[in-house]
């Protein structure tokens, strides 16, 4: 029998650790009265939306200005004082207390990185205190849907030092019968792609998210991916499709999109994306237009919304207010979920809930600056999101999430359902 007093927050500690790019980030540990402990590390993005919650950095010379000592101090000196004595089971109350303590619209006083670290660590402490997995604690008895992975195997844009304008070219193994098989399929294509690139004399060095970063044009990248899928023994569009993260805000300036040597209006950009969808088995396009180009997004949705998943990342920044604006204007049909864009677990769950009630899909996502923390793997199963973006099939901070999903699938046994096998997630074109 678990005593409720055992689940009361007793101590909170924090430290500065490193992410996958060698930059400092925040780790928090929440210890409960009964001895259970939860630990979490927050990620950090390279291409960040202008409307994201504020990530607190120290400035100055230390770590080239990227230290997080202030955020760590806020946790140990202010957040700990406010939260000790609260029940870890009341996630909403814990997060609300931190938001009230911060008092800003974008978490700029305490830092979203400080608040999120404690928020995630609290949930893990509660799960550990109850002796149940995190996905079960967050999702209850219906948490059994394994997500379709969107595997970023060719990196460009802000994630790689190459000529590729679009940020991510992803494999989507929706035709697999299980997550384990989806992972195998993606891995086999990844290694086939590596050999293809090597045979063509191209670089097989990897970018921030573990994908290859060759000097290619956007069309060439699509062509070599389709070739790799076929050479690995799979059917493009039927078993494995493609997804893009255009990250178009990165090359949007003065009302025009500059990429592949051209300069395009919003309408012309939509036309470029339409051509790619006609040419390749693309089932999902993320940030096809810039974060504040609402008119362009509306046109994109009218033209392609019935054919492919249109994901708002910089557009929505995991924020219910911006998502509601999209819903009200019939803009996009999917939201990318990044816990550090909004900065607390409760607000993340609220965004996923609003999306689901409004007919929008949710894609749980990592950041380019990641760590060994696997919270998002559990979150994807807990929320039955049906899709996850967590990078390529290399670099241990990416693979850690895939391995956690394998463990969850094994633990669920016959109760496990792969989203692709039941028609959830982005659909292929046979």
Curated annotation (Swiss-Prot):
Q: How is the cofactor bound?
A: Binds a second Mg(2+) ion via substrate during catalysis.
Q: In which pathway does it act?
A: Carbohydrate degradation; glycolysis; pyruvate from D-glyceraldehyde 3-phosphate: step 4/5
GO MF terms, alphabetically ordered? magnesium ion binding; phosphopyruvate hydratase activity
Lyase among keywords: yes
The keyword Lipid biosynthesis belongs to this UniProt entry's keyword annotation? no
List the PROSITE patterns: ENOLASE (PS00164)
Signal sequence, renumbered to the chain = none
- Give binding positions for Mg(2+): 245, 286, 313
Q: What's in the keyword line of the UniProt record?
A: Cytoplasm, Glycolysis, Lyase, Magnesium, Metal-binding, Secreted
- EC number(s) per UniProt? 4.2.1.11
GO cellular component, alphabetical, reads: cell surface; extracellular region; phosphopyruvate hydratase complex
Record-annotated active site: 209, 338
- Residues recorded as binding (2R)-2-phosphoglycerate, renumbered to this chain, are 167, 338, 367-368, 389
* Family to which this protein belongs: Belongs to the enolase family.
Q: Which PANTHER family does its entry note?
A: ENOLASE
Function summary? Catalyzes the reversible conversion of 2-phosphoglycerate (2-PG) into phosphoenolpyruvate (PEP). It is essential for the degradation of carbohydrates via glycolysis.
Name of the protein this chain belongs to: Enolase
Q: Which organism is it from?
A: Synechococcus sp. (strain CC9605)
């Amino acid at each position: 029998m678990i005593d409720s007093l055992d689940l009361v927050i007793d101590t909170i500690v924090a430290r500065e650790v490193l992410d996958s790019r060698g930059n400092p980030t925040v780790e928090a540990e929440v210890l409960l009265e009964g001895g259970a402990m939860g630990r979490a590390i927050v990620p950090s993005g390279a291409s960040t939306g202008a409307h994201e919650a504020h990530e607190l950095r120290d400035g100055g010379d230390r770590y080239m200005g990227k230290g997080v000592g202030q955020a760590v101090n806020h946790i140990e000196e202010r957040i700990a004082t406010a939260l000790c004595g609260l029940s870890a089971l009341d996630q909403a109350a814990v997060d609300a207390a931190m938001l009230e303590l911060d008092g800003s619209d974008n978490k700029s006083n305490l830092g979203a990185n400080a608040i999120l670290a404690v928020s995630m660590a609290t949930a893990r402490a509660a799960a550990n205190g109850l002796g149940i997995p995190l996905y079960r604690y967050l999702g209850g008895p219906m948490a059994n849907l394994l997500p379709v992975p969107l595997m970023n195997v060719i990196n460009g844009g802000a994630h790689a030092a190459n000529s590729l304008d679009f940020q991510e070219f992803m494999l989507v193994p929706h035709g697999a019968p299980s997550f384990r098989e989806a992972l195998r399929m993606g891995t086999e294509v990844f290694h086939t792609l590596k050999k293809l690139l090597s045979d063509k004399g191209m670089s097989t060095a990897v970018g921030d998210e573990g994908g290859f970063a060759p000097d290619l044009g956007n069309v060439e990248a699509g062509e070599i991916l389709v070739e790799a899928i076929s050479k690995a023994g799979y059917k493009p569009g039927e078993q494995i499709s493609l997804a893009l993260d255009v990250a178009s805000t990165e090359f949007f300036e003065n009302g025009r999109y500059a990429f592949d040597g051209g300069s395009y209006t919003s309408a012309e950009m939509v036309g470029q994306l339409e051509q790619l969808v006609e040419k390749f088995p693309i089932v999902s396009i993320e940030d096809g237009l810039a974060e504040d180009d609402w008119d362009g997004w509306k046109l994109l949705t009218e033209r392609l919304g019935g054919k492919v998943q249109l994901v708002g990342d910089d557009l929505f920044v995991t924020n219910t207010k911006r998502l509601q604006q999209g819903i009200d204007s019939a803009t996009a049909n999917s939201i990318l979920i990044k816990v550090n864009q909004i900065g607390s677990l409760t607000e993340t769950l609220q965004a996923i809930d609003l999306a689901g009630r409004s007919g929008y899909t949710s894609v749980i996502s990592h950041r380019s600056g990641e760590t060994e923390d696997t919270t998002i793997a559990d979150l994807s199963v807990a929320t039955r999101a049906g899709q996850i973006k967590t990078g390529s099939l290399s670099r241990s901070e990416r693979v850690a999430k895939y391995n956690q999903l394998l463990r969850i699938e094994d633990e669920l046994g016959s109760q496990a359902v792969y989203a692709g096998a039941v028609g959830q997630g982005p659909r292929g074109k046979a």
